[in-house]
């Protein structure tokens, strides 16, 4: 089980420490054990309705002392509301779900009742209420139209702050936007005349600690009615059923952190209210409202503000998406040019560095590093070469396929000195890891930030809330212009485009290189042995021809001795051998550079019949018997090449099958193709030679003892590979051999309909 790296301290009422700026992120603000005094709070068992806890001021609002309330049931206390309350808040419902009612209470007049459930606990809040101005709903309707009509985010922020101030009457209303580092900036402000302006000011993250931001994300409205009012404890302070603090994160009456109360008083604020702006599940910002005097906003108006906050959240999401879409639209044609060039490129370096593509302008960058196939080159203003090497080495340590920052020195401290040309970085990987990548760089911008009284570092110096909120100007170094969200999305899409396009082209190049390497090796082997194997028959023919010229002849010129007859027979055999070798060499060299064959439906039985007819004299001479399966399939193949393959395989079986060879030709369906097996019962082949026989001119035994020319089986394997298939042998000494050629099916084949 994972453990929170910053666990909460126990609350002060359980012996926890005093909260300071150094430990405020660990303050348990959701379990204060007390409430604000402008209302009363009860907790009750979610099943029985038994009252478990009450605020010590309950008698002021409910007319009953805690000792009287404790142990009562909600059915007795709220007989009219209890059934509806149970139905509205069933067990397991979200804690954001509420039950609302207005009570006519003898002790306090009209009370607003708000109830929510936290696990097995019901939390009931009672506040005095009065009729809301009837113009309120109309004002909300008008506000909705105004928000929807705002043309951009800046206008939307201004409309929101002005509308909230008109609805509520707060002295100051700000829209406060969080940055990625959790600092916040006031991007819009509506204020009473005479108040100091905070528009454009930035505030450190410590002003709203992490646990407060998390609470604002879950519960959208927070009210501090009086920054000088004392909190009212719960009685008992712990839930008597669990002996644990009661979670009040969703209660509007929850007591405010003493640290935050002092912070507000130091600002001269008498009351405050905030409404969360949550976009995509993340806390985007706050509508922050300040009043110089205590101010209890009526519950109905608070609900209206919560609706307004939700609408603003949706409009922010819409406006930001529209801004990104408009930005992306301006890049679409540029992206298309890059994609088209990459798709037709065999040299990524040369193509992507072409000034006509303007990859620098695509991302509004000052410099670009292109890294492909172990080398890099640059465009525009970039750091010196050693720094580029170091930057690329650092990138290789980064996870993911996209890295972006507007402050490289913060992400990579060693890169701080590169700020003049590389304060900002946007990098995409277009290969495996970062071996192939594009890295855009932006130069440093000298920025002047207006802080609302203290920089983040200064805010850490005091143990208590700061007192000064005067404007403090800070020059920020090491920052570049932030990358627009549209640029980041564009980089991601460009990565996908280039990864696909370059991946295909690089794969083609690598395949071609491998094929070329293999082909060169085969040609070198061919050149090395061809002279010997071609010269041997020629040498023998020459020698025997010379002997023949020395033999006596009859008057009619015919041989007149057995020796002459033997020489003549030898010449004929060697001439035949030379002819066979020449034909096989011609076929093999043609296949080395041949395109994939055109595969048509080919009846295998017809091809086997043709081969056996060609081999009929040899079959008769050897006394061989050949068994052919009765039904052979139609195979997707080049008929001529398939015939050559079977001619060699069956011919091999005749040569090496022993006396009176017994040969079998069979087929079987294997996966998405057919296996053709040619078997003999000859001497067999030892395992260590079973791959060697498929190499060029490799024959078992010495040259004088071995049969064949050493080209037949390599030729057969090449034919199989050109069809996308394989050729293997199964054999053992003394047990014969089976050569298996597997040929895959093809897609729709030419002439398939007529087969």
UniProtKB/Swiss-Prot annotation:
Domain Histidine kinase, which positions?
Answer: 529-747
* Residues holding a tetrapyrrole: 24
PROSITE patterns documented for this protein: HIS_KIN (PS50109), PHYTOCHROME_2 (PS50046)
Please report the name of this protein according to its UniProt entry. Answer: Bacteriophytochrome
Between which residues do disulfide bridges form? none
Source organism superkingdom? Bacteria
| Function description | Photoreceptor which exists in two forms that are reversibly interconvertible by light: the R form that absorbs maximally in the red region of the spectrum and the FR form that absorbs maximally in the far-red region. Also has a slight blue shift for the far-red maximum. Could also absorb green light. May participate in regulating pigment synthesis like the carotenoid deinoxanthin which could protect the bacterium from intense visible light.
PTMs? Contains one covalently linked tetrapyrrole chromophore. Lacks the cysteine conserved in plant phytochromes (at the position of Met-259) that binds chromophore. An engineered sequence used for X-ray crystallography forms a thioether link to biliverdin through Cys-24. The natural sequence can bind phycocyanobilin and phytochromobilin in vitro, but the identity of the natural chromophore is unknown.
- InterPro entries under this entry? GAF (IPR003018), GAF-like_dom_sf (IPR029016), HATPase_C_sf (IPR036890), His_kinase_dom (IPR005467), HisK_dim/P_sf (IPR036097), Light-responsive_reg (IPR052545), PAS-like_dom_sf (IPR035965), PAS_2 (IPR013654)
Catalytic activity, as annotated: ATP + protein L-histidine = ADP + protein N-phospho-L-histidine
Gene that this sequence comes from: bphP
Q: Does the keyword Repeat apply?
A: no
Q: What is known to happen upon mutating residue 260 to A? A: 100-fold reduction of chromophore-binding activity
Phosphohistidine carried by residues: 532
Determine if Metal-binding is one of this entry's keywords. no
**Which family is annotated?**
In the N-terminal section; belongs to the phytochrome family.
What keywords are assigned to this protein? ATP-binding, Chromophore, Kinase, Nucleotide-binding, Phosphoprotein, Photoreceptor protein, Receptor, Sensory transduction, Transferase
**PAS domain: which residues?**
26-94
EC supergroup of this enzyme? transferase
Q: Which GO terms describe its biological process?
A: detection of visible light; osmosensory signaling via phosphorelay pathway; regulation of DNA-templated transcription
One GO MF annotation is: identical protein binding
What's the EC number here?
Answer: 2.7.13.3
Question: Where is region (Chromophore binding domain) located?
Answer: 95-504
């Amino acid at each position: 089980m994972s453990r929170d790296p910053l666990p909460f301290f126990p609350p002060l009422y359980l012996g926890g420490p005093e909260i300071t700026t150094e430990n405020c992120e660990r303050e348990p603000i959701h379990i204060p054990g007390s409430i604000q005094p402008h209302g009363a709070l009860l907790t009750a068992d979610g099943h029985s309705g038994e009252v478990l806890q009450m605020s010590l001021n309950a008698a002021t609002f409910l007319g009953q002392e805690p000792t009287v309330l404790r142990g009562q049931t909600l059915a007795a206390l709220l007989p009219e509301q209890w059934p509806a309350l149970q139905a509205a808040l069933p067990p397991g419902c979200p804690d954001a779900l509420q039950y609302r009612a207005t009570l006519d209470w003898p002790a306090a007049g009209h009370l607003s009742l708000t109830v929510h459930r936290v696990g097995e606990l019901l939390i009931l809040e009672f506040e005095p209420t009065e009729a809301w101005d009837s113009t309120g709903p109309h004002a909300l309707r008008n506000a909705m139209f105004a928000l929807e009509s705002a043309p951009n985010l800046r206008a939307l922020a201004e409309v929101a702050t002005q509308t909230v101030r008109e609805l509520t009457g707060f002295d100051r209303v700000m829209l406060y936007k969080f940055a990625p580092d959790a600092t916040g900036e006031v991007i819009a402000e509506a204020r009473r005349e005479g108040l100091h302006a905070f528009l454009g000011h930035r505030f450190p993250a410590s002003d709203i600690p992490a646990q407060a931001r998390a609470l604002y994300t879950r519960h959208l409205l927070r009210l501090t009615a009086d920054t000088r009012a004392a909190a009212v404890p719960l009685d008992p302070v712990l839930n008597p059923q669990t002996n644990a603090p009661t979670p009040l994160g969703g209660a509007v009456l929850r007591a405010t952190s003493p640290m935050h109360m002092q912070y507000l008083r130091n600002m001269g604020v008498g009351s405050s209210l905030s409404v969360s702006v949550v976009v995509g599940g993340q806390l985007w910002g706050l509508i922050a409202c300040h009043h110089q005097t205590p101010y209890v906003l009526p519950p109905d108006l608070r609900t209206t503000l919560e609706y307004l906050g939700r609408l603003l959240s949706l409009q922010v999401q819409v406006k930001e998406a529209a801004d990104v879409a408009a930005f992306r639209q301006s890049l679409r044609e540029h992206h298309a040019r890059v994609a088209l060039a990459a798709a037709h490129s065999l040299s990524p370096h040369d193509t992507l560095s072409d000034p006509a593509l303007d990859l620098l302008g695509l991302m509004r960058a000052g410099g670009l590093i292109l890294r492909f196939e172990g080398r890099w080159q640059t465009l525009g203003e970039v750091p010196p070469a050693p720094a580029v090497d170091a930057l690329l080495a650092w990138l290789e340590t980064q996870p993911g396929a996209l890295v972006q920052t507007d402050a490289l020195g913060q992400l990579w401290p060693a890169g701080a000195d590169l700020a003049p040309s590389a304060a900002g970085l946007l990098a995409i990987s277009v290969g495996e890891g970062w071996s192939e990548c594009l890295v855009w760089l932006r130069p440093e911008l000298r920025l002047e930030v207006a802080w609302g009284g203290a920089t983040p570092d200064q805010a850490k110096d005091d143990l208590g809330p700061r007192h000064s909120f005067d404007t403090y100007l800070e020059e920020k170094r090491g920052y570049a212009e932030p990358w627009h969200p549209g640029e980041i999305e564009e980089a991601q899409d460009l990565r996908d485009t280039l990864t696909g396009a370059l991946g295909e082209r690089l794969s083609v190049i690598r395949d071609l290189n491998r094929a070329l390497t293999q082909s060169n090796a085969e040609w070198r082997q061919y050149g090395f042995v061809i002279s010997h194997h071609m010269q041997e028959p020629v040498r023998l023919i020459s020698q025997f021809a010379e002997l023949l010229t020395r033999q006596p002849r009859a008057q009619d010129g015919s041989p007149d001795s057995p020796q002459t007859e033997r020489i003549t027979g030898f010449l004929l055999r060697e001439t035949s051998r030379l002819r066979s070798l020449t034909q096989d060499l011609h076929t093999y060299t043609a296949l080395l550079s041949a395109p994939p064959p055109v595969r048509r439906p080919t009846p295998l039985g017809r091809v086997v019949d043709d081969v056996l007819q060609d081999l009929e004299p040899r079959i008769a001479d050897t006394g061989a018997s050949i068994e052919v399966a009765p039904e052979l399939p139609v195979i997707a193949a080049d008929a001529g090449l398939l015939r050559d393959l079977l001619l060699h395989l069956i011919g091999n079986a005749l040569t090496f099958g022993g006396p009176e060879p017994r040969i079998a030709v069979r087929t079987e369906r294997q996966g998405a193709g057919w296996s053709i097996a040619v078997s003999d019962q000859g001497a067999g082949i030892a395992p260590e030679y079973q791959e060697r026989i498929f190499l060029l001119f490799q024959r078992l035994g010495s040259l004088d003892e071995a049969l064949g020319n050493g080209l037949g089986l390599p030729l057969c394997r090449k034919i199989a590979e050109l069809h996308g298939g394989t050729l293997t042998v199964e054999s053992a000494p003394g047990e014969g051999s089976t050569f298996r050629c597997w040929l895959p099916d093809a897609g729709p084949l030419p002439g398939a309909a007529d087969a």
